[in-house]
């Protein structure tokens, strides 16, 4: 019995530590969102900050706001395959498969080639089983 109690205590300590770590991560994320938001108020086209802010908004689950950032990045960097890839992810997270597939195709046309990551990226879960997604991979993966 004492052994089971010890395991239980260790588990609760681990849970508390994990909760503290998650809380610290969220506090850091909130800080960054505020900090980078202020920078963008002064310089709305600061590409490096936009990239970080878009990623942070997505991590926070604020997908619609992340989409707006990703759209702006594509406007600022129309030939950047990563900007298009991130925009495709935003569309997929918002369950907009037509736009996600179209934008993902554009990312690949512009040179995005990390197909292994594309297959595993959780942001693309909503389109992973779409025949157009599989077709896109078949078309470009071996070129």
Sequence positions of predicted segments:
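Long, contiguous interaction/recruitment modules in multidomain scaffold/adaptor proteins
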Residues: 1-38, 143
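Terminal, compositionally biased segments used for targeting/anchoring and flexible tails
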Residues: 5, 75-76, 93, 110, ...
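TPR/TPR-like alpha-solenoid helical repeat scaffolds
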Residues: 20-26, 114-139
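Alpha-helical adaptor scaffolds
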Residues: 21-25, 37-95
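Alpha-helical repeat scaffolds
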Residues: 32-36, 71, 104, 137-138
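Short coil loop/turn residues that delineate tetratricopeptide repeat
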Residues: 45, 79, 113-114, 120
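TPR/TPR-like (Sel1-like) alpha-helical repeat modules
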Residues: 98-115, 138-143
């Amino acid at each position: 019995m004492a052994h089971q109690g010890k395991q239980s205590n260790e588990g609760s300590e681990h849970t508390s530590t994990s909760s503290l770590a998650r809380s610290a991560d969220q506090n850091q994320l909130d800080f960054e969102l505020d900090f980078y938001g202020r920078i963008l108020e002064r310089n709305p086209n600061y590409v490096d900050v936009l990239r970080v802010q878009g990623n942070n908004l997505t991590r926070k689950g604020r997908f619609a706001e992340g989409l707006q950032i990703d759209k702006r990045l594509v406007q600022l960097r129309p030939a950047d395959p990563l900007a298009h890839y991130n925009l495709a992810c935003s569309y997929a997270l918002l369950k907009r498969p037509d736009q996600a597939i179209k934008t993902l195709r554009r990312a690949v046309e512009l040179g995005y080639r990390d197909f292994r990551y594309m297959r595993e990226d959780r942001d693309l879960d909503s389109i992973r089983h779409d025949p157009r997604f599989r077709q896109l991979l078949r078309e470009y993966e071996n070129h």
